[in-house]
Amino acid sequence: MDAIKKKMLAMKMEKEVATDKAEQTEQSLRDLEAAKNTIEEDLSTLQKKYSNLENDFDNAKENLTVANTNLEASEKRVNECESEIQGLNRRIQLLEEDLERSEERLTSAQSKLEDASKAADESERGRKVLENRSQGDEERIDLLEKQLEEAKWIAEDADRKFDEAARKLAITEVDLERAEARLEAAEAKIVELEEELKVVGNNMKSLEISEQEASQREDSYEETIRDLTHRLKEAENRAAEAERTVSKLQKEVDRLEDELLAEKERYKSISDELDQTFAELAGY
């Protein structure tokens, strides 16, 4: 029982650790979402800059016909920027899809962790019920043993009374042979002894029936104890299975953390590329 309690305590501690790591993973996802929003704002700023660049280009075309060559070069550069922006938008879209899949896997892991926690709690409740029932059965067996001892004592006392009655009957028969005058008193005594014998006989029969019933109840209790022992073993097996499930979930959470770390690195790379692009656009 102590081993099961220790396992259940360890499993609860592992569940709490897994929950903390899951919360940290959710926080990382929120941070990634904030970074994505920042990138979107930067892209919006870039689009505004591009719009301003087009306006400047139109004004330059109207006012400076001499700068056609430079203007064509600027248009080429704008087209290149548009291509780069489209590529970045595509990469951002793919990154958002990766984030959605990561969130789905995290949700699945949390669901499995909740199921494992419920299974562990159910195993703990089953174990306590089994302990209470086992204790109740032990108390009933002790009571049954006491009743059996009392029945044996009553049977022995009945035997002694029977022997005493037989002895008295023998004495009465001797007295009857020796004294006819005391016949009436002896007959009354015999009737009394016969009544005692009947009572003793009935008590003996009752004791035999009680002893048989006690034996049957004891067999029933033994069968109940065997059944409880089997159910306890099943509860231990379920607890072990729940522990293995928690271990698997821990591995899944670790894997998700590694994936999130990789996503953060990808975000950093994209951010660096955007900064470089903004610097190049600012130069124009």
UniProtKB/Swiss-Prot annotation:
Keywords: Allergen, Coiled coil, Muscle protein, Repeat
Chain coiled-coil ranges: 15-273
UniProt record similarity statement: Belongs to the tropomyosin family.
InterPro entries membership: Tropomyosin (IPR000533)
GO molecular-function terms, A-Z: protein homodimerization activity
Tissue: Expressed in mantle muscle (at protein level).
UniProt remark on domains: The molecule is in a coiled coil structure that is formed by 2 polypeptide chains. The sequence exhibits a prominent seven-residues periodicity.
Record function comment: Tropomyosin, in association with the troponin complex, plays a central role in the calcium dependent regulation of muscle contraction.
UniProt-listed Gene3D superfamilies: 1.20.5.170, 1.20.5.340
Record keyword Glycosyltransferase present: no
Post-translational modification: The N-terminus is blocked.
Superkingdom classification of source: Eukaryota
Keyword Repeat: yes
Stretch list, region Disordered: 103-136
Pfam families, A to Z: Tropomyosin
Known partners and oligomeric status: Homodimer.
SUPFAM superfamilies, per the entry: Tropomyosin
Name of the protein: Tropomyosin Tod p 1.0102
Biotechnological applications listed in the UniProt record: The reaction of this protein with ribose in the Maillard reaction may be useful in development of processed seafood with low allergenicity.
GO biological process, one term: regulation of muscle contraction
